[in-house]
Structure formats: C-alpha cells, structure tokens
C-alpha cells in the first residue's frame, strides 16, 4: 500500500484533549477503510506565519499512514468538513521517517536549551 504523511492544523482555542480526539477520529477513518496509521505526533501549539481564519496559532498534528488512495480521499473529505481543522495537507512519500520527525527533534532541542538557561 502507498505511504502518506497527513498534517493538519487545529484551531488554537481547542484543548489538548480535543486535538487528541481529532487525531483519533482521523485514525478511525483510516482504519475503517482498511488503512493503517503507523505513527501519530502532536507538535503542540505553534505560531503561524500569517493569520488563518482569524487564528494566529494552531495545534499541529502529523499522521503517518499506509492506505489506498480512496481511503486518503475519504480522510481529506472528512477533514475538510470539520470546522475545528483550519488547514491540512496530505503528501505521498516513498518511506516513513524512522524515529521522531524533524519538528519533534526541534521541540526537544528547544526544551533542553530552555532548561539549560533556567539552570544557570
């Protein structure tokens, strides 16, 4: 089956539990259409480069998916209908990245630097 990366941005006023529920709903859509979600990453609340639907920040979520094109079409259709999702993008990839994504590594690096500054 083809491999995809699906990233969506959720509104800034949602709680983390609501964002996790959105990710779980996307996983359910994929699995009910005979696909498989291999990894889910929540990158947290991040600033946007420009306002999107009056939002300056958004919760970022990444899903690594193994599924057919029809499954991805259904996932995108359901994502587009959801008012809590302000942007999404699905990209077909040759292989999924092993371990944490670049964004997660960047977040870990920033946290460790912050701890070092506070400890000094």
Curated annotation (Swiss-Prot):
Give the GO molecular function terms: small ribosomal subunit rRNA binding; structural constituent of ribosome
Q: What CDD domains does this protein's entry cite?
A: bS6 (cd00473)
Instruction: State whether keyword Thylakoid applies.
Output: no
Any single GO CC term annotated in Swiss-Prot or TrEMBL for this entry: cytosolic small ribosomal subunit
The record ties this protein, via PANTHER family, to: MITOCHONDRIAL 28S RIBOSOMAL PROTEIN S6, SMALL RIBOSOMAL SUBUNIT PROTEIN BS6M
Q: Which family does it belong to?
A: Belongs to the bacterial ribosomal protein bS6 family.
Q: Which UniProt keywords apply?
A: Ribonucleoprotein, Ribosomal protein, RNA-binding, rRNA-binding
Region feature Disordered, mapped onto this chain = 97-120
Question: Mind telling me what this protein is named?
Answer: Small ribosomal subunit protein bS6
One Pfam family from the UniProt entry?
Ribosomal_S6
Describe the function of this protein: Binds together with bS18 to 16S ribosomal RNA.
Under NCBIfam families, the record lists: S6 (TIGR00166)
Source species, domain of life: Bacteria
Biological source species? Novosphingobium aromaticivorans (strain ATCC 700278 / DSM 12444 / CCUG 56034 / CIP 105152 / NBRC 16084 / F199)
What parts of the sequence cross the membrane? Answer: none
Q: Which GO terms describe its biological process?
A: translation
Q: Where are the compositionally biased (Basic and acidic residues) regions?
A: 105-120
